[in-house]
Design a protein with these regions (language model features):
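RNA-binding basic/glycine-rich loop and surface signature characteristic of RAMP-family CRISPR effectors
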Residues: 1-128, 132-174
Length: 174
């Protein structure tokens, strides 16, 4: 028996959030690092791969003895949930059991009704070169506080592995 478990939720931005898009070319005076946006609506969005990668990184920091440069060296429970490109003893690559969908904004009307016209803001920052003490100003676009994004995660459960399923769901829930 094989089944899929759907995990749904809402991610609320508590402070300005930047998940960057391409900044291959920036005109003078333009934002140096724009936010990734939904091509249909031009609203900020969160790629599922970004959340999945962040989840894996945080869990790897918690469960690995040392931070691994290569994700194939993660502990077995993380590789079982998120996959590994390393072949096992049978020559099989371990596929991810988790699918994280792209997250789109779900409260645009609520934000507009509060009199807020834009869903992003531009934050001016400085990075200072430690050796020369020269400031390098830059502009970062961020999704504003209060935006909400729908989360949809699918976990692929395999029959006969009930103990693993419980452990995997607990791991994802962290």
């Amino acid at each position: 028996m094989y089944s899929k478990i759907q995990i749904k939720g809402v991610l609320e931005v508590k402070t300005g959030m930047h998940i960057g898009g391409s900044s291959a070319f920036s005109a003078i005076g333009a934002v140096d690092s724009p936010v990734i946006k939904d091509i249909r609506t031009n609203n900020p969005m969160i790629p599922g791969s970004s959340l999945k990668g962040k989840m894996r990184t945080l869990l790897a920091r918690k469960y690995n003895d040392v931070v691994q440069a290569n994700a194939n060296k993660d502990v077995d429970c993380i590789k079982r949930v998120f996959g590994s490109s390393e072949k096992d003893e049978k020559g099989v690559i371990k596929q991810s059991r988790v699918l994280v969908s792209d997250m789109f904004m779900i409260n645009g009307d609520e934000i507009r009704n509060r009199g807020i016209s834009g869903f992003t803001e531009v934050k001016f920052e400085n990075s200072i070169n430690r050796t020369t003490a020269v400031a390098m100003p830059r502009q970062i676009e961020r999704a504003i506080k209060g935006l909400k994004f729908g989360i949809d995660i699918i976990y692929e459960a395999k029959s006969g592995k009930e103990a693993e399923i419980e452990e995997d769901i607990a791991l994802i829930s962290e």
